[in-house]
Amino acid sequence: ELVDKKSGVSARLTIAAYENAVSAAERRAIMNNEKTTQVWLSDLTGIIPSITGKIELVYEGEQEGPYQVAYNLLERAIRTQFIQYFPNPDSLKKKKGKEQVTENPYKSISKWFDGGNNLNIFLDIKDEDKIRLLYHVDGLHALVKKYFNSGTEKEDALLMEFVLHGLAAHSLISK
């Protein structure tokens, strides 16, 4: 609703976004002297310039600002994709006058954060350090293994990061 639908979005946006995501990962690898890396969800902040440079906003979007609109689009995409791979957190929330039927698979993760724990993962952190930090969150690895039991350590870690971003997008934890 903040993007001018009449202006259209060219295929160049997708290409530029892909290149910027890969570039963010390569930059991080070079800074940390790593031979290999992967694109993490946190690298997707690198695509924001691709979005702001390729979309036209309506008046309300201009008022909010191109950066914020791009960030919100990214957040909405994570929210939409999250429920394709993991249970929808919105369906687990208690409705007025109704009992919660399904066990909340995110309970131990939320409880870990509610207990005063936090996770500070900076954009330029080494892959091995990021993986180590992700494993500190109670229940996070178990949740990923429950739904994707055949991943490698790096694939699991990427999914663990995805879960955290997804839960934040669904307001179960704070960023």
What are these regions (language model features)?
Residues 4-13:
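An accessory alpha-helical subdomain
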Residues 12-30:
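C-terminal helical "lid" of AAA+/P-loop NTPase domains
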